[in-house]
Amino acid sequence: MNLSLHDLYIGYDDDASRYVVAEALNASLTGGVMACLVGANGIGKSTLMRTLSGFQSALKGEVCIDGCALEGYTPRELSERVGVVLTEREAMPDLTVEEVVAIGRMPYTNFWGTLTQADRQAVDEALLLVGIGHLRHKKIGHVSDGERQKAMIAKALAQQTDIILLDEPTAFLDYGSKVSVMRLLRQLAHEQGKAILLSTHDLEIAFQTADELWILQHEGLQTGTLDALEQHGAVSAFLAKSGLRYEAEQRRIVFV
């Protein structure tokens, strides 16, 4: 499974005007890889994630899955290929964790949303994979932020897509929960062969866990491994704008 961007322009378009957030973006993500999208506030990370998810139309260029543009898929076909986890809290506090995860099976259920044995098995496996099987009967509104985020990841896993996109999955979590979620996502990419792209502001954790980095700046999008990007000066240039420096030997970020 391959997700690719080809000369992609993202932003907003209406009858009166067009606002380009970022332009001429090119990148590719394959199965078994966890990539972290990083960039300054307001640079367009969420807009890019929404465009890759098909929630927002591109102004120009293409987003492709296995060489086919998103527009070539029906909504159902797209939901069978791409799972999405957004930052916003979903308005369903009275549903149990298990019921929330089961929503991930909607692309496969009948008109009435009836779960088959195979659907229930997919839900069970997703709950166990993220380590929250013991919370299945607890209301989603009564669990911690970290547990809730794991439930959202389990919902995406129950959807059984090859690509998972997550917008700020570690936002609002304490440090331990941030590390736990990032390790979980990397494990899922490596062991389940998922292509995982997540946006984050947690640079140090991203640098330590990501297989690849997508650095979004006004100059464009640069992608690659941390070491490769550092060798080309991309990491240093990116961090310098915020008064930071990357120390490669210690693999840490420090204030200048």
Language-model features, listed with the residues they occupy:
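H-loop/switch region of ABC-family ATPase nucleotide-binding domains
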Residues: 200-201
